[in-house]
Amino acid sequence: MPTAYLTRIVEFTATHRFPNTPEFAGATSDHSHRYRCAVTVKGVFDPARGGVMSLPVLKSLLQREVVGRFDGRHLNEDIAPFSEGKWVATGEALALHVWERIAAALPAGVGLHCVRIEEGANLYAEYRGDT
């Protein structure tokens, strides 16, 4: 059976800040983004089901684990591991964090292919798992 991919995009607004170090010059104060998060799942195409997994199930999962978790929040203050000081709240780190939450909640037989976090029209980060 062929492998198929399904991508769902959600949006949320969140605030973050970077440490006052040379690599983050100019972005060390609190600032917000209207993030777009694209999550792509993969699995065996099931002709009887019409695809990889139920779209309402994926939509509900993203609503709970992404929008419900991050929308209106301050990443550095409200969301572990950022609030614990373990990770810097970058797009790359956010993509990895979303990956960890979504991968653990997918139905059997469905895998995660990519998490893409867009901070704006000209900046995005992707995580595709450890390869």
Residue ranges: model-predicted function:
Residues 1-131:
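Charge-rich, low-complexity N-terminal segments
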